[in-house]
């Protein structure tokens, strides 16, 4: 099958430096891969997509999500709480309220939000598991992704020991056994994991948080099994100052040192957040090639802080973007996340500016992140972290994962540089098309077979059901 995208106004590649922008204006796709980029002549019987006045980006790669939280947006008990109190008030409070129907609907809503922003690959850190569960949340995540044509990286969360904020949970939601957790990871790898470059299904070892979800000896065994199986490792780390306090109190070391002691650093490992890091931790992450899923909107919503991507990237840490769960980020789409990352990295550097009489050397932080940087983090960076070696950039020979944005909303009127529109202007740009492995999964801003109005009504009913079950 041959497909040609013609007349693009601008193309961002996901590559660094001068290669970040491509002249185009045409892209030919054959057998799911990019075959040519330049001024091309259509071939006989070649399907064409006219991208006139459109901007093309690599399809976004979201490296951290909790899809089940898509039915927990704006939940009042946790709306103005910081992380630990929010965990008790919202996600832990509602975990037992989910059944197969509400879980499936939440996953579908989250995936649709991402699709409509130009995201085709999603790492879902799913931690809704308990013994004798009457439905298989892993199967639901994969099947919903398949129905929408998306690439799913299932990060198999869970815990084999509890923490203080979980002590009041129903018995059914208490920690799993270590043997049960490990056996299920092996089951999932055997059934779903596909290591091929064009794969649409991957599995990751992902205990919910390394400091609290399992004893150190078990963490080592998890890392060992993951590497034997050829899968990656993921977890939360250093989201707030509480991680520093907990690691010192429990282990007499920093959180990153704890990870190093238990074989949880390396280029096959990435952590969500990494907001509160000491300089020596940044250096250690960089030396080992351990990655970050930067979640600026969730970190802002919970008041956790802003990760120092400048220092992390300079140290050698691979950088990617994640939307986190919608219970702490009501704008859980990749365009919103990219816009926030662009602004907040600049604001973070600007907060460090000092007057010259006090030794300051710069006025502000506008050079901290370019739109091209953010596109690279959200595409090539994500693909690198997830081990998708043939995805993430627009280059000949790469998988054709790309988003064609139609900049026809008033927010884009007056732009001098259309290429930056999908990131710089915020909001959601309509999609001319979204392709994964060269196959359109969104066309003319519509997802085939999806009834958004019915989904809206289902969501309203599901929220009421969850509130009743959680008695809030």
Ranges and model annotations:
Residues 74-125, 130-151, 183-197, 460-471:
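Alpha-helical scaffold segments that flank or form the walls of functional sites
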Residues 8, 27, 32, 53, ...:
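Divalent metal-coordination and catalytic microenvironments
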Residues 149, 227-232, 264-267, 284-293, ...:
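Glycine-enriched alpha-helix->loop->beta-strand junction motifs that scaffold or abut catalytic
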Residues 132-275, 280:
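Metal-coordinating catalytic core of metallo-dependent amide/deamination hydrolases
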Residues 1-25, 30, 40, 372-472:
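Active-site microenvironment of metallo-dependent hydrolases
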Residues 261-268, 310-407:
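His/Asp/Glu-enriched, well-ordered alpha-helical/loop segment
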Residues 71-103, 161-178, 241-268, 288-291, ...:
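Active-site gating loops and adjacent loop-to-helix segments of metal-dependent hydrolytic enzymes
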């Amino acid at each position: 099958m041959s497909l040609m995208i013609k007349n693009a106004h601008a193309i961002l590649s996901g590559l660094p430096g001068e290669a970040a922008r491509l002249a185009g204006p045409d892209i030919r796709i054959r057998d799911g891969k990019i075959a040519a980029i330049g001024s091309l002549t259509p071939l006989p019987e070649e399907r064409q997509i006219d991208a006139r006045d459109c901007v093309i980006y690599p399809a976004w790669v979201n490296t951290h999500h909790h899809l089940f939280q898509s039915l927990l947006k704006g939940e009042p008990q946790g709306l103005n709480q910081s992380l630990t109190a929010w965990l008790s008030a919202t996600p832990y409070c509602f975990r037992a309220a989910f059944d197969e129907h509400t879980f499936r609907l939440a996953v579908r809503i989250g995936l649709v939000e991402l699709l409509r922003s130009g995201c085709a690959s999603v790492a879902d850190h799913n931690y809704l598991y308990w013994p004798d569960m009457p439905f298989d949340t892993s199967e639901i995540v994969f099947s919903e992704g398949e129905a929408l044509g998306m690439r799913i990286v299932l990060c198999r969360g869970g815990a084999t020991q509890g923490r203080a904020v979980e002590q009041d949970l129903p018995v059914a939601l208490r920690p799993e056994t270590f043997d049960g957790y490990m056996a299920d990871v092996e089951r999932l790898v055997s059934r779903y994991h596909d290591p091929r470059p064009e794969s649409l299904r991957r599995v990751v070892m992902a205990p919910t948080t390394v400091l609290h979800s399992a004893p150190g000896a078990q963490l080592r065994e998890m890392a060992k099994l993951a590497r034997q199986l050829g899968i990656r490792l993921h977890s939360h780390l250093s989201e707030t100052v509480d991680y520093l306090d907990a690691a010192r109190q429990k282990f007499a070391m920093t959180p990153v040192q704890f990870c190093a002691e238990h074989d949880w650093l390396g280029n096959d490992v990435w952590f969500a957040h990494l907001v509160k890091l000491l300089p020596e931790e940044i250096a250690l992450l960089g030396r080992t090639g351990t990655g970050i899923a930067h979640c600026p909107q969730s970190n802002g919503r919970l008041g956790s802080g802003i990760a120092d991507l400048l220092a992390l990237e300079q140290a050698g840490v691979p950088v990617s973007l994640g939307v986190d769960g919608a219970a702490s980020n009501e704008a859980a789409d990749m365009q919103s996340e990219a816009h926030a990352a662009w602004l907040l990295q600049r604001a973070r550097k600007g907060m460090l500016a000092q007057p010259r009489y006090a030794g300051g050397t710069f006025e502000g932080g506008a050079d901290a992140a370019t739109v091209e940087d953010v596109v690279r983090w959200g595409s090539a960076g994500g693909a690198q972290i997830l081990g998708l070696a043939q995805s993430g950039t627009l280059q000949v020979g790469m998988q054709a994962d790309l988003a064609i944005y139609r900049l026809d909303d008033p927010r884009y009127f007056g732009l001098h540089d259309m290429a930056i529109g999908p990131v710089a202007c915020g909001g959601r740009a309509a999609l001319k098309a979204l392709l994964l492995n060269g196959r359109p999964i969104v066309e003319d801003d519509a997802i085939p077979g999806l009834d958004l109005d019915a989904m809206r009504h289902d969501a309203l009913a599901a929220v009421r059901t969850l509130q009743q079950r959680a008695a809030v």
